[in-house]
Amino acid sequence: MGLVGDMDMTDNMMIRSYRNGKGPFLDRKGPRALAEKIKDQLEVMTPSISAPVRQMSGGNVQKVLVGREIAQNPKVLLVAFPTRGVDINTSHVIYQLLNEQKKKGVAVVCVIEDLDVVLELLSLIHI
């Protein structure tokens, strides 16, 4: 599930929890705290978590997306070209996040075209 460009970080965090909501009122405290945590931990460059994500660079959008999905504590994480179009520093951050998930026992399924990254990041390769 992607991000909505006209929505801010908090609203994009809430996308994953709309179906769990009770009634027409949604709790924004948890998603706001998650947005702040992702912004700080992944060094997302944005003037505010209230700014629309379309105003962010591609690398920062990727950080928000990967951070949101990892925050769901998945058992399986499927990513396709997670660093396409991002700068080298952001790609290292994203690969580090995926590696941390692998160490936690999460099955990380990747579609990646860079063989060096594949050999460094993954423990099982299918071609």
How does the language model describe each region?
Residues 1-125:
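Glycine-rich phosphate-binding loops of nucleotide-dependent enzymes
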